[in-house]
């Protein structure tokens, strides 16, 4: 009888603790901010080689350079967890599958879409490094060409970079103790938005820096090809 009573008390404590942890995780997720700006520091910190991209004058060569550079980027510390906006994560696997282009809804700009796949480990509040997820996500960014009034040369203008949360897919890798599983199931919905923001914070500054180094003629050529139907890639 004593054992049964102790078990009831223990279950009550676990339920209360899990509710508290869910609240802690929710607070961490809600406090995430989106960082979205290209910076010279991005290239310096990641040791990006943009020489071939700067020399590219056609879209095919620029696309190849962007994909090659992105797929070589070391995202965080592969041997440990990287702090990011109150959460800790480690990117175990990462790949950009493609770089697709299409005409934007205004008929003047180019919309770029990058399908991404990740395997990520999260360290959640109190629980520790217990959550491994596989993620597929589309990263979106618009670009346009504007003529420099002083030089008369075309220049690249960047739109907002964002993750397409309508297309995000998250799968939990492996299961653990029932107590931990309950917490993971409870936060899986929260993680959809959190993962999108975290990946935007990691990749958007990198992508925008790469796009900012492109020649205007490469984007102008891409826009001309899309407008004339020579390049029609559905987004």
UniProtKB/Swiss-Prot annotation:
An annotated GO cellular component: secretory granule
Annotated keywords: Antibiotic, Antimicrobial, Disulfide bond, Secreted, Signal
Molecular-function annotations in GO: lipopolysaccharide binding
InterPro entries linked: Bactericidal_perm-incr_a/b_dom, BPI_fold-antibacterial, Lipid-bd_serum_glycop_N
Principal location: secreted
Subcellular location as annotated: Secreted
Stored Pfam families: LBP_BPI_CETP
Disulfide bond annotation, renumbered to this chain: 161-204
Tissue specificity comment: Expressed in parotid, submandibular and sublingual glands.
Signal peptide: 1-20
Keyword RNA-binding attached: no
Any one of the GO BP annotations: defense response to bacterium
Keyword Metal-binding among record annotations: no
Top-level taxonomic group: Eukaryota
Function: Has strong antibacterial activity against P.aeruginosa.
Family indicated by similarity: Belongs to the BPI/LBP/Plunc superfamily. Plunc family.
Protein name as catalogued: BPI fold-containing family A member 2
Species of the source: Rattus norvegicus
């Amino acid at each position: 009888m004593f054992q049964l009573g102790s078990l009831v008390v223990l279950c009550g404590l676990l339920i209360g603790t899990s509710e508290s942890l869910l609240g802690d995780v929710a607070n961490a997720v809600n406090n995430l901010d989106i960082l979205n700006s290209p910076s010279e520091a991005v290239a310096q910190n990641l040791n990006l080689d943009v020489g071939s991209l700067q020399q590219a004058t056609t879209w095919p060569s620029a696309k190849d350079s962007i994909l090659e550079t992105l797929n070589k980027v070391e995202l965080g510390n592969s041997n440990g967890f990287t702090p990011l906006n109150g959460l800790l994560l480690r990117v175990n696997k990462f790949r950009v599958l493609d770089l697709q282009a299409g005409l934007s809804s205004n008929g003047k700009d180019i919309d770029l879409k990058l399908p991404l796949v990740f395997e990520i480990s999260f360290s959640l509040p109190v629980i520790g490094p217990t959550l491994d997820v596989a993620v597929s996500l589309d990263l979106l960014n618009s670009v346009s060409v504007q003529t420099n009034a002083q030089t008369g040369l075309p220049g690249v203008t960047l739109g907002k970079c964002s993750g397409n949360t309508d297309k995000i897919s998250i799968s939990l890798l492996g299961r653990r103790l029932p107590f931990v599983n309950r917490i993971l199931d409870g936060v899986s919905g929260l993680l959809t938005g959190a993962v999108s923001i975290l990946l935007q914070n990691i990749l958007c500054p990198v992508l925008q820096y790469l796009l900012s180094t492109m020649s205007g003629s490469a984007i102008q050529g891409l826009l001309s090809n899309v407008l004339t139907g020579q390049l029609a890639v559905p987004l």
